[in-house]
């Protein structure tokens, strides 16, 4: 039965992606958005909708006057919008491997930070890019490859293995070099930096469970320390980057100034300091477009407590 479910999962993903790539873009966005919104139909503790609402409550509460809570109706509305945006993300990812260079360039605009890219390149080495789960970062990665900044990016392993292999092939077609998340991922990233390439890490979720404690949207949690560790060990600049989806089916990228990665103490202390600085930049990025934050898993200790209570 497990093999049948795995096969069905593989066929569902691959056939849907093939369909998205062969229909008009507007149709693909509508279909994918509709399918994704079905995820929001289930409510209650521990569901994707509930997790999105918890994350957005923190995001909006961080902008409120102390003691004032965000409007629950507003939180629900924004949370449901994330599913539509998530569908658009999947539709874009399905057609991106088949896009021409002209198509990729025409639908991407680097709104801010080209000077940071050029300054990092002038140093004669690669650099580290840290991103949140916002918008369509793969589109930015494909554009970077065309601009001469090829990216080696960490990718969470998926099950079944043939589905993971399919996703790897898709990202290679985008100009990205995927590396499975795990103990062996640092080697390829370091080699990419030494080859004057980009090491990309999506860093707003501690998927392994061995992250660095930070305050993120006013609450203690852990975030991955990999980006900070790589920058400290290689001397590469650490650039926070975000790619938003914009009206008219195009994408808007921003490269922020490099974080201060000066060695000031022990490696552990410096990684903690830099990761906290990165968390503050991510807060700013996410606040600008909270509806594009695709995070439906527990990300704070209190989220795990709620999920555990729901299962009980």
Regions found by a protein language model. Name each.
Residues 1-128:
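Membrane-anchoring hydrophobic helices of lipid-metabolizing enzymes
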Residues 2-4, 8, 62, 66-71, ...:
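Non-catalytic C-terminal accessory region of glycerolipid acyltransferases
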Residues 46-51, 157-161, 220-224:
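Active-site metal-coordination segments of metallo-dependent hydrolases
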Residues 15, 51, 115, 139, ...:
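Short Gly/charged-rich anion-binding patches and loops
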Residues 96, 123-183, 209-212, 216:
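Catalytic core of membrane glycerolipid acyltransferases/transacylases, capturing the structured
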Residues 103-109, 156, 175-181, 216-218, ...:
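Short, flexible loop segments at the rims of nucleotide/cofactor-binding pockets, characterized by
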